Swiss-Prot record:
Major role in the synthesis of nucleoside triphosphates other than ATP. The ATP gamma phosphate is transferred to the NDP beta phosphate via a ping-pong mechanism, using a phosphorylated active-site intermediate. It comes from Haemophilus ducreyi (strain 35000HP / ATCC 700724). NCBIfam families: PRK00668.1. PANTHER family: NUCLEOSIDE DIPHOSPHATE KINASE (PTHR46161), NUCLEOSIDE DIPHOSPHATE KINASE DDB_G0292928-RELATED (PTHR46161:SF3). The active site is at residue 116. This is Nucleoside diphosphate kinase. Keywords: ATP-binding, Cytoplasm, Kinase, Magnesium, Metal-binding, Nucleotide metabolism, Nucleotide-binding, Phosphoprotein, Transferase. The gene is ndk.
Amino acid sequence: MLQQTLCLIKPDATQRNLIGKIISYLENAGLKIKAIKKLQLTQAQAEKFYLEHQDKPFFASLVGFMISAPIVAIVLEGENAIAHYRELMGATNPEQREAGTIRALYAISNQENSVHGSDSETSAKREIDYFFSKEEIC
């Protein structure tokens, strides 16, 4: 099934000039870029985007990290794009990351793990709509 999903290249990766490497990795894996933008999140934007985590102990540090440097938001498209991209990302936990995944290659820690990806069709729609208008996706 053809799907779209959201990829965020996080501040740790943008600060280390990994944007091009991550985009190449995604395209080489067969995903198409339908929209892309680089932006600096405000605290309010980061808090709203991660609202589902507001009661978790890591919320404040996550928001602080996400506003620490620019991010890149990307709409990816492909067959079963949500699951495919999540496989390419690799596990959040460093000890569970499979070799060759984006996080195995570039992550520094659980939080500084280079990329974010939607975990379901519902979250993909919400997250894509958060960053992109319909006119920006082509």
